[in-house]
Amino acid sequence: MTALWIAIAALSALGLLFGLVLGYAARRFEVEEDPVAEQVDEILPQSQCGQCGYPGCRPYAEAVANGEMINKCAPGGEQVMLKLAELLNVEPQPLGSEAAAEPVRQVAYIDEANCIGCTKCIQACPVDAIVGATRAMHTVITDLCTGCDLCVAPCPTDCIEMRPVATTTANWKWDMKTIPVQVIHVEQHA
């Protein structure tokens, strides 16, 4: 019986010793995160689409914190670019390409009659906007879809296509540059 208690005590002592060594190593070799990259990463839409040329939002956030252009996030568009410009205290930049300058929001559409239920699109979707079960038809939740286009390529039956979102009163945005409104500041009015 004493051999059992000796084994328990020895294993407990080893566990405590290794825990202390790991705790010390974690504090001694801690890698400090860039706080600017953290803030930039919080602003990005986290769609992990790769349209910016980086494999995900975190690598792009680190690149932006190191001086990369702030206008490469296609899913975030102008809103994200303006937030990044404000955070980094830099001038807003025009969006990356002419197609991105006037983005037409697109969402994935699945032709449910041709869907074989392989779930490859579900696995490819970074924001879980596609629902369905194995060997059953799938559908896209358009409110969640970011239009990243990552679900189209894996589809073996080519039943997924990107379609532009119809402009309605719910998603239409005023072009404030074309409206001739003069802003009157309170100090000038009084």
Swiss-Prot record:
Pfam families for this protein: Fer4_21 (PF14697), FeS (PF04060)
E.C. numbers: 7.-.-.-
Organism listed in the record: Serratia proteamaculans (strain 568)
Biological processes, Gene Ontology terms: electron transport chain
Binding site for [4Fe-4S] cluster 1: 49, 52, 57, 73
Subunit composition and interactions: The complex is composed of six subunits: RnfA, RnfB, RnfC, RnfD, RnfE and RnfG.
Full protein name: Ion-translocating oxidoreductase complex subunit B
Top EC class for this record: translocase
Cofactor annotation comment: Binds 3 [4Fe-4S] clusters.
Names of required cofactors: [4Fe-4S] cluster
The keyword Thylakoid is annotated on this UniProt entry: no
